Amino acid sequence: MRIGVLTGGGDCPGLNAVIRAVVRKGSVDFDDEFVGFLDAWDGVLEKKFIELTVGTMRGMLPRGGTIIGTRRGSPFDHADGPQRVRNVCDELGLDGFVVIGGNGSLSVAAELHAQIGLPVVGVPKTIDNDIVGTDVCFGFNTAVQI
């Protein structure tokens, strides 16, 4: 499979570690390929991405932030946004997305799945710890302890 990865919403600790884990597990165990979209959904709409490999993930654990950038926003901010997402998936041969984000990013991912059938896996991330169905989201403990 070829999978798009993006981090949406605000920055928080642990994003690079999650990206690294997704890429390593998928690449090593399932021979998947990964594309990291720069600055969340904006990167998808503008087709700005980098290839993510086990090699590019080396040294990521101690680095803060996210190597692919993050931003708030939605393809639904544009009349043709959902269709542009579908077109990018088709052009790049993407089978689905891993979306790492909070309520906004995960809601967008769910709506894209509903409207255009985009397969998505959501990774809950928020310093607010307000995502239904989770006990503690990564990013929260560091936010309240610092």
Name each model feature, range by range.
Residues 25, 59, 88, 111-112:
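Hydrophobic/aromatic ligand-binding patch that stacks against planar heteroaromatic rings
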Residues 17-22, 103-118:
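Short Gly/Thr/Asp-enriched flexible loops that form oxyanion-binding sites at enzyme active sites
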Residues 31-35, 113-137, 144:
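Short, acidic/small-residue loops that bind anionic groups at enzyme active sites
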Residues 9-13, 100-107:
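Gly/Ser/Thr-rich loops at beta-strand to alpha-helix junctions
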Residues 1-3, 29-33, 62-65, 92-96, ...:
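Short coil/turn connectors at secondary-structure junctions
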Residues 44-99, 104-105, 123, 127, ...:
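Glycine-rich oxoanion-binding loops at beta->alpha junctions
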Residues 1-45:
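N-terminal phosphate-binding or glycine-rich loops at protein starts, especially the Walker A/P-loop
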Residues 15-16, 46, 108-110, 132:
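Short glycine-/acidic-enriched loop or helix-start segments at secondary-structure transitions
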